[in-house]
Amino acid sequence: MKRILLLSAATIISAALSAQTVANMNDLKPEKKAMAVSLKLTGELSTKGNSDYRQMRDLCFQTRTIDLSDANSTELPNNAFHSRHQLEHITLPKILKSIGTQAFFACDKLHDITIPASVEKIGAAAFSGCKSLTELTIEGQPVIGEYAFARLSGLKTVKLNSKVPPKADVSSFYGIAPGSVKLIVPKGSEKAYMKATGWSRFYAEPKIGNEVSDPTLCLTPMPQVLNVQKGAKTLNVHTAWNIVVAHMDGEGTILNNEVEQAREMLSNRIGNIVNSRQRGLQLVLDIDSSLEDNEAYTLTVDAKGVNIKGKTPSGVFWGLMTLDQILRGSGNKECVDAIPQLTIKDTPRTHVRELMVDPARTFIPFNELKAFIPEMARYKLNALHLHLVDDQAWRIEIKKYPQLTEQASYRWGQDDIQMPYKGYYTQEQMRELVAYAAKYHIDIVPEIEMPGHEVAAISVFPELTCHQRRVPIRTTCGVSNELLCPGNEFTYEFLGNVFKELADIFPSKYIHLGGDEAGNPALDCWTDCPKCQALKKKIGITTTDRSENWKLQGYLFDHIIELLRDTYHKTPMFWYETDFKKIQPGCVTFAWRQGLTEKALDAAVENNARIMLCPGEHCYFDYPMAKGDMPEVNWGMPVTSLKATYSLDPSWGKGADFEKNNLFGVAGTLWSECITTPERIYYQAYPRAIALAEAGWTKNKPSYDNFLVRLKSTAKDMMRRGITFSMEY
């Protein structure tokens, strides 16, 4: 595959400035797709798998204008141009009948759009977040879905040709203030539009009926105990709220952060100014040391207001997140009108509920990474695992080795996606992230891979390898055979210096060491390395059945684990491989390989170790949630369905003793080889991350059908707030 950087500047400029006119995307060479600024397609367009639409979205990352007017396409599929930030203008097919859900989500440079008269349906959130869209023309009478044109802050004019208002949802144009957008309709139809659902918003704020929150329909994760007092008087929430800390002179002073979080949450939901001088409802925050778990809390709603008690500030915070969902209710509006009197007693099933993101493959800008944290907290996820290095890039500043980010923080492309990525995190940014996450009671766990998945470092320091070969940064998926050399003293010096700086940056008790996919065949490059052979002889490794290389990896790991555990007081973590015959005391292993979870759990029990459950069939969120869902890649992917994630049993059927003595937590992984924008990370994560949160939190979780009912309110709230998620469930 040709790389963009190998093309001359003249070729880039000439190719980019010329419009590409073809029947379909297969008529364009990869470099033409990567550099096309203008596209015109005239043939029959495919919509499934590695389709014409997938290629336009993912491979034509510089394209600004697209003309599909003469294309043979009746369906614009779901997510067709999802978060394609460079797109400024598109002419839709003349024969188009449907526009899928989130088809133009967050196309924030799109400035105008005309919906042809042939279109019969516009899906939910189809144009949500197109903040530069100023002109919208609808020529026919399509049915318009929920939040289809929501959050269009730049919209100035909407023109319609139909005298009969197209059927719309009350939320279709959410965010438009009455009188702020010029609505041009056929003469004589003004009154019809003023009365029509969805369209009346252009003239006056829509009236939505009063709602009393029903916690049985809106809470995720579901609390362990929820008792709603039927018949008791409900509390009107649209009044003054007074936030009170029960023990200001003692333990209560540690709740300053939770007070600020409560104030922000009430302001966002209710809009009222919290004023302690006015009579109103009380929100009492308190510490209850009698609760068993550090994250446990109780929440009581009575005639005076809300009382939240936690074993620690973490418990109080999770109680606030539960209150936020109660105030959200059905999600039809920012806040319900009233809440019932109730009692909640809650505690987590697992101590760690983690998401892993992968900025090594696709860099996540720092502000976008920060923004991911509050959304996690809404569902009581409490750890964010950062996969900071891999074969494709090195993303964390190491002051001892500035060359790592100077030379290895640029990724030329990945497989058929020839989109360049660059960027890294400074140490100050990571400290800021840690402090920010702490406000949401989320732990930041860094990962540095070893001995495999280290090509980015090897490209800078070839002396880290057995044969000291300089290799380029990897631009494909898969496994590299270039590994760190355990027989080389510089390997230990390098890793020691890197982990020294990481230990200073990240206060977490945990550091992840990688350990997976070290070559294919595994560790093979150590077999003929003179330094590795000398080390084997020195430490008494005599086997020749390839187990000797795993023993050598154990030697390397033992040294780094001892350093982390004894010098920096960190608990090492690593991805479990079935050839690990010994798990060092105190370590946490990750059961990740699809179909091999049973072996990983047995090894944890045998070694009296703790284990994080993240098997691919339940927890790989980079996989599509359903067949045909993003990411549609050219080589195909397995499916991890929402139901599969929800069905995860953290104990894996091994009973209470395993859960108590060996289970560490549950984790969802977001490997980013095929995730091209920050918005796509949310899309791949949710709603599966919510299902994972409930699997990890709720001891006796309800049925999957019950979860889907409760998910409806969450989905509406996410659309209202402009958060993307997969709707393929």
What are these regions (language model features)?
Residues V37-T47, Q62-E75, H85-S98, D108-K121, ...:
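Structural signature of tandem-repeat unit edges
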Residues P572-T578, K582-Y729:
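Flexible, acidic glycine-rich loops studded with aromatic residues
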Residues N79-A80, G100-A103, G123-S128, E146-A148, ...:
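Consensus positions within tandem repeat domains that build extended binding/scaffold surfaces
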Residues A457, P462, I473-C587, Q594-T597, ...:
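Active-site neighborhood of glycoside hydrolase catalytic domains
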Residues L291-Y510, W526, H559, A667-S672:
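Feature activates predominantly on carbohydrate-active enzymes
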Residues M1-T21, N210:
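Bacterial Sec-dependent N-terminal signal peptides
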Residues G209-H351, P572-Y576, S713-Y729:
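Acidic, contiguous N-terminal accessory segments
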Residues Q20-P30, D214-M222:
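Boundary/junction segments of secreted and surface-exposed precursor proteins
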